[in-house]
């Protein structure tokens, strides 16, 4: 990741060399689409933060969604700022701000991935061990986990910045080691745990819903949809960060991979609010004038639904949604 950041001049050189070519045109088109996606995503995540932070009663799961929306908003803001700075003259001040925005983007990315891993793992535990989870789960576990993840990601990215920044004491050997630790953490721990827990959750809830003739809860759909979108759209950015340094790709190919990974990651961070409101508005023909807050609250509801769409008066979390 940091090796890629510090070698970003290769991409800039390729862009300067290929001005007027098909590659440069593709870069401009993809960057414009990414900027538009970032602006839409910032609006959507800001709406989620406003509703969850000031307009709704929050259950423990909503704490995760609130923090995930904040991480996505920070990622999209830094991505949009980076895209804007690329059009400015490369003076010394702009270079420093450009690197700051990239560091901020990597920080927000790791926070978002960590939160998604925590969300999918917690939901998996809640369906595999419902009684134990309900009785032994600390009251403020969600807030503690979110605070811990933000702190750990801040420390990790602060450490990498101290070793890998072009404007601080750059140490290539230490930067390489820190880069490998980050790669192992993201690609070898967080992503596999998130994928495995989500797959387990899907299989368990699918079997339970068929056995008890209940529809999966909307919360279950939200979790799986968010993880799936991340794996499809945002994971390529990690692959770009960690694979590009090892491969001697032509400059034109680097530009295309660079642009496509940014566009796909911006789509991933912008998609979650859309998922919440689409899932929350299912079967909304009975209440066609529901507010956005009500729709969001329905999407994050933990109670299971019966086949006809009713919510049981006394529900458990045993079937997993």
UniProtKB/Swiss-Prot annotation:
Q: Name one GO molecular function term.
A: G protein-coupled peptide receptor activity
Q: How does it sit in the membrane?
A: Multi-pass membrane protein
One matching Pfam family = 7tm_1
Listed GO cellular component terms? extracellular space; plasma membrane
What residues are glycosylation sites in this protein?
Answer: 2, 6, 16, 92
Entry-linked PROSITE patterns: G_PROTEIN_RECEP_F1_2 (PS50262)
Region spans: Disordered: 302-321
CDD domains noted in UniProt: 7tmA_MrgprD
Ordered alphabetically, the record's keywords are: Cell membrane, G-protein coupled receptor, Glycoprotein, Membrane, Receptor, Transducer, Transmembrane, Transmembrane helix
Which residue windows are transmembrane per the record?
Answer: 34-54, 60-80, 113-133, 143-163, 185-205, 219-239, 258-280
Matching entries from Gene3D superfamilies are given as: Rhodopsin 7-helix transmembrane proteins (1.20.1070.10)
Has UniProt tagged this entry with the keyword Transmembrane? Answer: yes
Q: Does the keyword Magnesium apply?
A: no
Q: Which residues lie on this side of the membrane: Extracellular?
A: 1-33, 81-112, 164-184, 240-257
Spell out which residues lie on the membrane's Cytoplasmic side: 55-59, 134-142, 206-218, 281-321
| Entries under InterPro entries matching the protein | GPCR_Rhodpsn, GPCR_Rhodpsn_7TM, MRGPCRD, MRGPCRFAMILY
In which broad location class does this protein mainly occur, judging by the first location in its UniProt entry? membrane
Which Gene Ontology terms describe the biological processes this protein takes part in? adenylate cyclase-activating G protein-coupled receptor signaling pathway; angiotensin-mediated vasodilation involved in regulation of systemic arterial blood pressure; G protein-coupled receptor signaling pathway
Origin: domain of life: Eukaryota
Subcellular location(s): the record lists:
Cell membrane
**What role is this protein assigned?**
May regulate nociceptor function and/or development, including the sensation or modulation of pain. Functions as a specific membrane receptor for beta-alanine. Beta-alanine at micromolar doses specifically evoked Ca(2+) influx in cells expressing the receptor. Beta-alanine decreases forskolin-stimulated cAMP production in cells expressing the receptor, suggesting that the receptor couples with G-protein G(q) and G(i).
Q: Which family does it belong to?
A: Belongs to the G-protein coupled receptor 1 family. Mas subfamily.
Protein name per the record: Mas-related G-protein coupled receptor member D
Q: Which gene encodes it?
A: MRGPRD
């Amino acid at each position: 990741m940091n090796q890629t950041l510090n070698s970003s001049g290769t991409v800039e050189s390729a862009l300067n060399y290929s001005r007027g070519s098909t590659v440069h045109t593709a870069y401009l088109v993809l960057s414009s689409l990414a900027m538009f996606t970032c602006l839409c995503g910032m609006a959507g995540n800001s709406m989620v933060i406003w509703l969850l932070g000031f307009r709704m009663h929050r259950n423990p799961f909503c704490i995760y969604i609130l923090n995930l929306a904040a991480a996505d908003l920070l990622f999209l803001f830094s991505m949009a700022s980076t895209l804007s700075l690329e059009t400015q003259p490369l003076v010394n001040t702009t270079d420093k701000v450009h690197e700051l925005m990239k560091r901020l983007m990597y920080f927000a990315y790791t926070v978002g991935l960590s939160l998604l891993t925590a969300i999918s793992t917690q939901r998996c535990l809640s369906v595999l061990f419902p009684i134990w989870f309900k009785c032994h789960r600390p009251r403020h576990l969600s807030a503690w986990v979110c605070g811990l993840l933000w702190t750990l990601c801040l420390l990790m990215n602060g450490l990498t910045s101290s070793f890998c920044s072009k404007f601080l004491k750059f140490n290539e050997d230490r930067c390489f080691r820190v880069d490998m630790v980050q790669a192992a953490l993201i690609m070898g721990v967080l992503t596999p745990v998130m994928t495995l827990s989500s797959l387990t959750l899907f299989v368990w809830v699918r079997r339970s819903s068929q056995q008890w003739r209940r529809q999966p809860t909307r919360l279950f759909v939200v979790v799986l949809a968010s993880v799936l979108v991340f794996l499809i759209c945002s994971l390529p950015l990690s692959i770009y960060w960690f694979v590009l340094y090892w491969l001697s790709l032509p400059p034109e190919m680097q530009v295309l991979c660079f642009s496509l990974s940014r566009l796909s990651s911006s789509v991933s961070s912008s998609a979650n609010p859309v998922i919440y409101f689409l899932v929350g508005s299912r079967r909304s023909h009975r209440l066609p004038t529901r507010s956005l807050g009500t729709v969001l609250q329905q999407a994050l509801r933990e109670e299971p639904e019966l086949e006809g769409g009713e919510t049981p008066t006394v529900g458990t979390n045993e079937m997993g949604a």
